[in-house]
């Protein structure tokens, strides 16, 4: 997993009711981040979300629902915009294998 700067991963959720909040009641929901995920800078991931393997989350996104594997997802709320293709893998500079 590659996590860029200023990413917030939080499992805590609070009640809307002020009396419950003042009592300190909160719920923690698990977060699952798959293998080979890239999370862009400033992204917020909220409790209960699952990000599938090999997905890319765009900078500044708010992930509150599940993101499937092998997609590019962005936005507030974060949504998949498309599958990652073989062409995507060729588009950016390839580093020599002996440097990896």
Regions found by a protein language model. Give the residues of each.
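Flexible, glycine/small-residue-enriched loop-and-beta-strand segment within the central core
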Residues: 1-49, 76, 84-85, 89
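Beta-rich strand-turn-strand
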Residues: 41-56, 61-65
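A generic membrane alpha-helix/interface feature
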Residues: 18, 66, 93-95
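Structural motif
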Residues: 32-35, 50-54, 67-70
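Acidic/histidine-enriched, glycine/proline-rich intrinsically disordered or flexible terminal extensions
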Residues: 89-100
């Amino acid at each position: 997993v590659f996590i860029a700067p200023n990413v917030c991963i939080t499992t805590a959720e609070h009640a809307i009711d002020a009396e419950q909040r003042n009592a300190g009641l909160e719920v923690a929901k698990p977060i699952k981040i798959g293998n080979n995920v890239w999370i862009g800078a400033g992204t917020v991931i909220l409790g209960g979300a699952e990000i599938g393997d090999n997905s890319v989350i765009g900078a500044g996104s708010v992930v509150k629902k599940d993101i499937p594997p092998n997609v590019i997802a962005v936005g507030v709320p974060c949504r998949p915009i498309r599958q990652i293709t073989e062409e995507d893998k060729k588009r950016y500079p390839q580093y020599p294998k002996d440097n990896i």
